[in-house]
Design a protein with these regions (language model features):
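Short linear S-[DN]-x-LW-Φ motif typified by the pepsin-like aspartic protease active-site region
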Residues: 17-98, 116, 122, 135-140, ...
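Short, surface-exposed interaction patches in beta-rich subdomains
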Residues: 140, 147-150, 154-236
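Non-cytosolic head/periplasmic domains of membrane-anchored proteins
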Residues: 83-171
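Residue-level preference for beta-strand/loop junctions
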Residues: 49, 109, 212-214
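Short structured motifs
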Residues: 41-42, 111-113, 203-204
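Hydrophobic membrane-insertion alpha-helices, especially the h-region
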Residues: 2-18
Length: 236
């Protein structure tokens, strides 16, 4: 009984704090309802692989999963607060959490979304901006560029095929499996207090490395997080 009373008082105190910070009562109600509903929604979009050129993921504390499907259109499974997933005029699909106009420490996001990609999709560019959420993906085929900006979250990507990879890592963890071998890539590494492991080699200092005949680039700016890059040893 005492624990319940203390929890209730703490919750009321946080709501009062939200009012003091200028939050609209409707924002508080909608935010709380969105956090407690937990209802999984499945949506199907008439978006085919040949219509998709780019993918942009922008999350704060939510979780994103990308899966490769056998269907000819996009399928979305989500719960929590997300912007509608649509195809823009330039062929970009954006996965984005709805904006929060205020934040309270006792609200922990449980937003999650799974995007099942249509069979055979190839992207020109994929961008991932992750605060303290998590992003995981099946294999991705990217012709031009993969851009990762990771704060304190975790990103785990399997079998990435791309010409150029840009990684800006704060205090989170990023794990990538790249197509090919270590010798298929050139590297620019700017390493802070974190660890960068490429294949079997651990890098703790800045480095620029060029491999003979390598045409692909990985550019790394690592803060205090950990980056691990492995290879699937396929022939490119």
């Amino acid at each position: 009984m005492i624990l319940i009373s203390v929890t209730a008082v703490a919750g009321i105190g946080c709501i009062i704090a939200a009012f003091v910070m200028g939050a609209d009562p409707r924002q508080i109600r909608n935010y709380a309802e969105g956090k407690t509903s937990g209802k999984l929604q499945t949506e199907e979009r008439n978006i085919r692989a040949d219509q998709i050129r780019k993918l942009n993921i922008d999350i704060g504390s939510g979780n994103v999963k990308l899966q490769n499907g056998n269907q000819d259109h996009l399928i979305i499974k989500k719960k929590g607060s997300w912007e509608p997933v649509i195809l823009k005029s330039d062929g970009e699909i954006e996965i984005k959490q709805k904006s929060r106009h205020f934040k309270l420490f006792w609200f922990q996001s449980n937003d999650e979304i799974t995007v099942i990609l249509p069979k055979g999709v190839t992207f020109e560019k994929v961008s991932m901006d992750c605060g303290n959420g998590d992003i995981a993906s099946d294999s991705l085929n990217i012709t031009d560029e993969l851009v990762i900006d990771c704060g304190s979250g975790d990103i785990d990507l399997t079998t990435i095929t791309t010409s150029k990879t840009e990684i800006d890592l704060g205090s989170g963890d990023v794990t990538l499996t790249m197509a090919g071998t270590e010798k298929d890539y050139n590297y620019n590494i700017d390493c802070g207090n974190g660890d960068v492991k490429i294949g079997d080699i651990l890098f703790e200092d800045d480095l620029k490395k060029r491999n003979i005949n390598a045409l692909r680039w990985i550019n790394i700016d690592c803060g205090s997080g950990d980056l691990t890059i492995d290879f699937d040893n396929t022939i490119l």
